From Swiss-Prot:
It comes from Oceanobacillus iheyensis (strain DSM 14371 / CIP 107618 / JCM 11309 / KCTC 3954 / HTE831). It is an enzyme of class 5 (isomerase). This is 1-(5-phosphoribosyl)-5-[(5-phosphoribosylamino)methylideneamino] imidazole-4-carboxamide isomerase. It catalyses: 1-(5-phospho-beta-D-ribosyl)-5-[(5-phospho-beta-D-ribosylamino)methylideneamino]imidazole-4-carboxamide = 5-[(5-phospho-1-deoxy-D-ribulos-1-ylimino)methylamino]-1-(5-phospho-beta-D-ribosyl)imidazole-4-carboxamide. Keywords: Amino-acid biosynthesis, Cytoplasm, Histidine biosynthesis, Isomerase. GO terms for cellular component: cytoplasm. GO terms for molecular function: 1-(5-phosphoribosyl)-5-[(5-phosphoribosylamino)methylideneamino]imidazole-4-carboxamide isomerase activity. Belongs to the HisA/HisF family. Its EC number is 5.3.1.16. The gene is hisA. The active site is at residues 8, 129. InterPro entries: Aldolase_TIM (IPR013785), His_biosynth (IPR006062), HisA_bact_arch (IPR006063), Isoase_HisA-like (IPR044524), Isoase_HisA-like_bact (IPR023016), RibuloseP-bd_barrel (IPR011060).
Length: 240
């Protein structure tokens, strides 16, 4: 299972939000590039980055910073947040980003999603941000009437290979992932599943590993020190 340290960027800084609430922000670093280098130095094999400004506005506000992050690292990065055009996908791919994550656009524009998957294949992932079983959009600020599980099955049928599944009510709450929901997602698809939201302890990480998930994104727990990246990565190496 790949561990993805999370770098969420807002106003050019590395931050974390509680349950996606833009009014509950903690700034962890003024330099996302330096933060990314720290995670790479600690042994990270893949990085997860989000343009929070972009997720809310639909514009790729922090694209230059994310390009700098991609070019500063020797490990792959995946990027999400406000990516709603083929032009922006192409900019990220050209900048060295390994995987581009579509969120709102994947829900609201099926033609765009299909074209993106046909054009970029496994370089496209889709973010499923769920609240009580329904998908939220626009940086989690809007609830949709789209049910998560049927939509996940639909994604697989059009050729999506990787999804990021986030339980919004768990995100940043340090209360553990929603294992029951993740199990339901896993039963519904053979796509690569990256779990996100609520990973708080090494025990959470171990439980996710037993589910044979493709990956887990960890944010607040790494920044607050309740999980040490090197410790869980050493556990990964021992298990291999």
């Amino acid at each position: 299972m790949i561990i993805f340290p999370a770098i969420d960027i807002r106003n050019g800084k590395c931050v974390r939000l509680r349950q996606g609430d833009y009014n509950q922000e903690t700034i962890y670093s003024n330099s996302p590039v330096e933060m990314a280098k720290e995670w790479e130095a600690s042994g990270a094999e893949y990085l997860h980055t989000v343009d929070l400004d972009g997720a809310k506005s639909g514009e790729s506000n922090n694209i230059n910073i994310i390009q700098d992050v991609a070019q500063a690292l020797s490990i792959p990065i995946q990027v999400g947040g406000g990516i709603r055009s083929l032009e922006v996908i192409d900019k990220y791919i050209q900048a060295g980003v390994s995987r581009v994550i579509l969120g709102t656009a994947a829900i609201t524009d099926s033609v765009f999603l299909q074209t993106a998957v046909e054009s970029y294949a496994e370089k496209i992932a889709v973010s499923i941000d769920a609240r009580n079983g329904f998908i939220a959009t626009d940086g989690w600020t809007k609830n949709s009437t789209v049910e998560a599980i049927p939509f996940i099955k639909q994604l697989e049928s059009i050729g999506v290979k990787t999804i990021i599944y986030t339980d919004i009510l768990k995100d940043g709450m340090m209360s553990g992932p929603n294992f029951q929901e993740l199990d339901a997602v896993q039963q519904a698809t053979t796509m690569n599943i990256i779990a996100s939201g609520g990973v708080t302890t090494e025990k959470d990480v171990q439980q996710l590993k037993t589910m044979n998930l493709y990956g887990a994104i960890i944010g607040k727990a790494l920044y607050d020190g309740s999980i040490k990246l090197q410790d869980i990565l050493e556990g990964e190496m021992d298990a291999r």
